[in-house]
Amino acid sequence: MAQIQAQEEIVQTVWNNIRAEAREMMTQEPMLGSFFLQSILNQQTFAAALGFQLANRLASAVMPAVVLRELINEVYNKDPNVITAAALDLRAVVDRDPAVVYYSSPLLYLKGFLAIQSYRVAHYLWIEGRHEIAYFMQNLISITFGVD
């Protein structure tokens, strides 16, 4: 029970930081207001914001963002550890990369972070025996982010 609460606190702390940064950046760069609203401020949770980013980046003519988002949310709902790992990854980027000063930067801009989070979803699907969709996602990830 204590471990679950600690994980939830990590995710919530990261999410609170991201939302505060987005509000601040909206005042600094009003032209990006819609971007920050759609990407962060209109999302209820870190999982929703990450799912939004991944689905919109990986969307294709044969796999629209809305379908991908449902799939990603399904994984996040079944295994909250995937979201905790993403929050820890994000925090590690901020702590270890001197070029990254905002918690929102990896979520919004860094393809390496987004690729890893996408692969976490694909890996979960593979473990669940959903090999074809995992292969399909791997292909989308490779094409979109340029990583294998």
Question: Which role does the model predict for each range below?
Answer:
Residues 1-140:
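Terminal amphipathic alpha-helical/low-complexity segments used for targeting or macromolecular assembly
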Residues 138, 147-148:
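A short, contiguous structural element within a folded domain that forms the immediate neighborhood
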